[in-house]
Amino acid sequence: MVDNIQIVEALNAVLTDLTLQEISEKLEAPKSSDLGDVAFPTFTLAKTLHKAPQLIAADIVAAIDQEGFEKVVATGPYVNFFLDKVATSNQVLKTVFDLEGAYGDNVDGQGAKVTIDMSSPNIAKPMSMGHLRSTVIGNALANITAKNGYAPVKINHLGDWGTQFGKLIYAYKAWGSEEEVKSDPIATLLKYYVEFHEKAKENDSLNDEGRAWFKKLEDGDEEAHRLWQWFRAESLKEFSEIYDRLDITFDSFNGEAFYNDKMDKVVDLLEEKNLLVESQGAQIVDLSHINPNLTPAMIKRSDGATLYMTRDLAAALYRKETYDFAKSLYVVGGEQREHFVQMKAVLSLMGFEWSDDIEHIAFGLITFNGKKMSTRKGDVVLLKDVLDDAHELALKQIQEKNPDLGDKDTVAEEVGAGAVVFHDLMNDRTNNFDFNLEEVVRFEGDTGPYVQYTNARAKSILRKTSVQLTSDDLNLTDPATWDIITTLNNFPKTVQRAWQQREASIIAKYALNLSRAFNKYYANSKILTEDVQLNARLVLVKSVSIVLTESLRLLGVKAPEEM
């Protein structure tokens, strides 16, 4: 944040027991612009100073050097700073204009690696809306991670192993056909999977058949392995089409199968440390002494087959050895919370202090008309279908608003896909939310297209002028610009908070706030009037576009030049 150094130093002159860094981290934006431009809360000082926060705030204001600020006031437990508007406008606009997309970058991460386990669809099943959250939250966090100076490693831990493949192989051999699969691979494989579960309700022995085929696959049976490879290859083709549409790439596609030859090492280490206990023929790690409410971690079943826990432990060890991560994030639904608590507990018992660097980035559910989706029942909402429908809705609105726009199809794809991504990310990560596509793709309201349209509007203004913009004399005196200036000023702090809280919605909500501030200004101002402040106003418009474009990029959303 521009001018924060002055605020931090002024506070530090009074609060000598706090470091500059500690003060800087406490600064925040007031709830309303009427309260000031930057706020310093005093709650955490009450304990050490043995005073009520309101009194502490009043004491700070009485002692602080107010030179360089419009005013500094105490409002309850907050010290609120009102910045010098002309000087701050000049500083903020010059900084954004000069740095462009690098505005908001910081070097906190110092290049340290952060692995991000994300997306992870299951082979032989289509990508559904159920995969959207892990995919887009993971991608946005990777972008935010990089913006904060870290080196993200995006890992698509494919669900390409497990008892479900035994079930699928059995179903294919029992009532499937090669010709049917080749004609429509994923849809046919999904149909077999659903049919298997329907038949297994009437005949439980089918589950034994499925387990037996999976055991064959684990033991290297040639036919089982050939069918598994075929199912995997067909699935990856379809996944790649979806990822291309979302403009998402990965650094690794190492899925569950990759760790088949790495699990014995985990079992050996557990045995060496006397952590394995036999329970009803299975091998477990007892965690009750760590937390009495924690169920045992299952390592091997009674038939010798390995379990997800064994594989995830092997993956954690491999990732630490390969990437030496500073943090390892797992973007997985909130219902898996206990699994990650168990995994970290087992790694800790094994003596790996870096288990504390593993974080479960939990998220809530997407529902459609209040209903959760289930692949087993077959009532699944396909991500491809949603992206197709979003494209059509976006195209319809573009044709109405701008019939002469060139390459409408490309723009409609960027707007439609962007709308779906933005809507997911503007919701707090851990919240559940209901999905209504028509609301999501609207060009007004709290939507991705609204932010994209605002950015395109700013770019359109800049195309209408031949003025060569400079960063000289950016002293805007129009009070109508102040909301935009303070919002632009908050962007670097917003980027930091999004990383610290692992919360992409902070960026999405910021982009909406900046869009609203700009559109209010646009509706009430003559931006292109030829006067001495024309350059400053145009630099303001360009700065808005720079920061909106960067905000959208961090979220994984395109920023069309025109809409």
UniProtKB/Swiss-Prot annotation:
Its main location: cytoplasm. NCBIfam families: argS. CDD domains: Anticodon_Ia_Arg, ArgRS_core. It is an enzyme of class 6 (ligase). InterPro entries: Arg-tRNA-ligase, Arg-tRNA-synth_N, Arg-tRNA-synth_N_sf, ArgRS_core, DALR_anticod-bd, Rossmann-like_a/b/a_fold, tRNAsynth_Ia_anticodon-bd. SUPFAM superfamilies: Anticodon-binding domain of a subclass of class I aminoacyl-tRNA synthetases, Arginyl-tRNA synthetase (ArgRS), N-terminal 'additional' domain, Nucleotidylyl transferase. One of its GO terms (molecular function) is ATP binding. Monomer. Belongs to the class-I aminoacyl-tRNA synthetase family. Its EC number is 6.1.1.19. PANTHER family: ARGININE--TRNA LIGASE, CYTOPLASMIC, ARGINYL-TRNA SYNTHETASE. Keywords: Aminoacyl-tRNA synthetase, ATP-binding, Cytoplasm, Ligase, Nucleotide-binding, Protein biosynthesis. Transmembrane segments: none annotated. The keyword Zinc does not apply. It catalyses: tRNA(Arg) + L-arginine + ATP = L-arginyl-tRNA(Arg) + AMP + diphosphate. It comes from Leuconostoc mesenteroides subsp. mesenteroides (strain ATCC 8293 / DSM 20343 / BCRC 11652 / CCM 1803 / JCM 6124 / NCDO 523 / NBRC 100496 / NCIMB 8023 / NCTC 12954 / NRRL B-1118 / 37Y). Coiled coil: none annotated. It is found in: Cytoplasm. GO terms for cellular component: cytoplasm. A motif ('HIGH' region) lies at residues 121-131. Pfam families: Arg_tRNA_synt_N, DALR_1, tRNA-synt_1d. One of its GO terms (biological process) is arginyl-tRNA aminoacylation. This is Arginine--tRNA ligase.
